[in-house]
Amino acid sequence: MATTTMRMIISIILISTYVPHITLCQNITEEFYQSTCSAVSRGYLSALRTGWYTSVVTIELSKIQKNVCNGTDSKVKLIKQELERYNNAVAELQSLMQNEPTSSSRAKRGIPESIHYTRNSTKKFYGLMGKKRKRRFLGFLLGIGSAIASGVAVSKVLHLEGEVNKIKNALLSTNKAVVSLSNGVSVLTSKVLDLKNYIDKELLPKVNNHDCRISNIATVIEFQQKNNRLLEIAREFSVNAGITTPLSTYMLTNSELLSIINDMPITNDQKKLMSVCQIVRQQSYSIMSVLREVIAYVVQLPLYGVIDTPCWKLHTSPLCTTDNKEGSNICLTRTDRGWYCDNAGSVSFFPQAETCKVQSNRVFCDTMNSLTLPTDVNLCNTDIFNSKYDCKIMTSKTDISSSVITSIGAIVSCYGKTKCTASNKNRGIIKTFSNGCDYVSNKGVDTVSVGNTLYYVNKLEGKALYIKGEPIINYYNPLVFPSDEFDASIAQVNAKINQSLAFIRRSDELLHSVDVGKSTTNVVITTIIIVIVVVILMLITVGLLFYCKTRSTPIMLGKDQLSSINNLSFSK
């Protein structure tokens, strides 16, 4: 009965490099600003990713026909079982890349005999993604985004059989060689022969024996241990559809990682930092590629081009008025919270703080997620109304109570009838917060409670400084304060307030002018009426006087009239 077997040659650089341990003492200081309900945690050092370093790992599969083996020993069965597991792993990887051969062709090929495992470290970076990709693989790559574009470019090249043959041929007579790929990339390829020698000299002579006699169970165990890596690689790629992160020790062992770091075009300080920080693995990727009987995957490591510059984190919480009736308060919150790091004369701002990883007092951030700001942004902490930088805020009229856990304490925004306390696990409640924004350090405090929500404070060591000041929200008039401004600034809010005040002043002026006009008209009308009434009264008075005078005056006759009357009477 003809059977097949598999052997694996892992090409790795084993470089003995002394890497001194880096101790980062925690010297955190925290400043709480009562006026803006914010806190700044300082004392951190930067490790900002500015590029990628790409390495290539290839596993070459080939076949060999094995002599008839009729052995029934349990150890022989274990060997056969182990070979079958690897055959299934290879088939799964090929299926993942949609390059799975038919069952008949796979049966004709038989199980691959040898696996040549090489490590190739690229010496430059790439940023183009190939257009023609396998559908299943491409969909996942597009989901990752441009962060791994350089690794994808190399992965595309590895689909070309000629490129893989270049690597294979370069390693025929040497354990270390530089290969130039078709896209202009220079690849440093290295290998060692420890596993190859084991398979050739220890395993295959026993397995290929006619009766498959394996007298020592240690042979089986050692074979399982050495081949466990391929199984894990196949499992990780299968579960993650061709791209894995973080980078496991199966994808790249610690010795291999140190070897790659040693070859990176970075300073010794950067190499030391990368050698001792596990976050390097968390921020790395491995990208799979399969071509016929070659399994290849690209390992992409972060390059921290900016290190040891000061970093600080801004924490903010709602600041509301407390003197008004329930439902009529106004609130203001700084929206510029996140990580800040000095970078080449400016400040790199990372608004999504969770994208940065902290180890001790070292902050690992990706500059792809940052905004570049002027150094004047620091003025927002000490003088939010400064004229050099327009500080970012949001406004509302909803005074919701909450707490923000800082590096060495907690900010507590307590409003309305919510009960807010700080507690010690042994002494119970040690502080009750009044309405407003307050701060408590972690000295003697284990938890902070806001209503029914319990917060656990961090237990880092540091020094906290409470900077008192009048809450700036008290400077604003609730009647003209703009609400629901979610992406605003101090200048924009003040401008809207000034517009509202100007509108009110104009309304008052118009109202005043209308009142004055009405008053003048009323006076004129009243005056005219009074004059008319007076004139009428005067006319009536004169008429009455004249009439009365006429009625009361006797008739006086002259002498001539009287003489005429007398003569008339005598003549009769």
Curated annotation (Swiss-Prot):
Q: Which domain of life is it from?
A: Viruses
Q: What is the effect of changing T5A?
A: In strain: ATCC 51908
List the glycosylation sites: N27, N70, N120, N498
One matching Pfam family is Fusion_gly
Q: Where is this site: Cleavage?
A: R109, G110, R136, F137
Q: Name one GO cellular component term.
A: host cell plasma membrane
Keyword Signal appears in the UniProt entry: yes
* Extracellular topological domain: 26-522
Residue numbers on the Cytoplasmic membrane side = 549-572
SUPFAM superfamilies attached here?
A: Virus ectodomain (SSF58069)
Gene3D superfamilies xref list: 1.10.287.2480, 6.10.250.1160, 6.20.370.50
- SS bond list: C37-C437, C69-C212, C311-C341, C320-C331, C356-C365, C380-C391, C414-C420
Q: What is the effect of changing S114L?
A: In strain: ATCC 51908
Arranged from A to Z, the UniProt key words for this protein are: Cleavage on pair of basic residues, Coiled coil, Disulfide bond, Fusion of virus membrane with host cell membrane, Fusion of virus membrane with host membrane, Glycoprotein, Host cell membrane, Host Golgi apparatus, Host membrane, Host-virus interaction, Lipoprotein, Membrane, Palmitate, Signal, Syncytium formation induced by viral infection, Transmembrane, Transmembrane helix, Viral attachment to host cell, Viral attachment to host entry receptor, Viral envelope protein, Viral penetration into host cytoplasm, Virion, Virus entry into host cell
> Residue span of the signal peptide, if any?
1-25
Sites of S-palmitoyl cysteine lipid attachment are C548
Q: Which family does it belong to?
A: Belongs to the paramyxoviruses fusion glycoprotein family.
Name of the protein in its database record: Fusion glycoprotein F0
- Lineage in the entry? Viruses, Riboviria, Orthornavirae, Negarnaviricota, Haploviricotina
